[in-house]
C-alpha cells in the first residue's frame, strides 16, 4: 500500500483550518465548552492522519524481506520504533 499523500495533505489542511478556528474562538472569548468540542474534533482528525501514516509504515515493513520471511519480531521491533 502506498500512502495517498494528496488525501493526507487535504486532511492536514482541514486540521490547520480547525486549529485556526480554535484560535479565533479563543480570541473572541467563546465558551470553553465550544472550544473544547472543536479541540477534540481537531485531535480526532489529526489522529486519523496518524493512522493513515502508521498503516502505510506498517505495510511497508511487512512488505520487506523480513516480513515475507515470517520474522514478526523484527517487524514489530521496527514498527515500535515509529511510535
What are these regions (language model features)?
Residues 1-83:
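Solvent-exposed interaction patches of small proteins and small membrane subunits
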Amino acid at each position: 500500500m502506498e500512502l495517498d499523500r494528496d488525501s493526507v495533505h487535504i486532511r492536514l489542511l482541514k486540521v490547520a483550518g480547525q486549529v485556526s478556528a480554535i484560535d479565533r474562538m479563543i480570541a473572541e472569548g467563546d465558551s470553553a465548552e465550544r472550544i473544547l468540542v472543536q479541540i477534540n474534533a481537531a485531535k480526532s482528525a489529526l489522529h486519523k492522519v496518524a493512522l493513515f501514516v502508521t498503516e502505510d509504515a506498517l505495510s511497508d515493513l511487512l512488505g520487506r524481506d523480513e516480513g515475507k520471511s515470517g520474522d514478526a519480531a523484527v517487524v514489530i521491533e521496527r514498527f515500535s520504533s515509529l511510535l
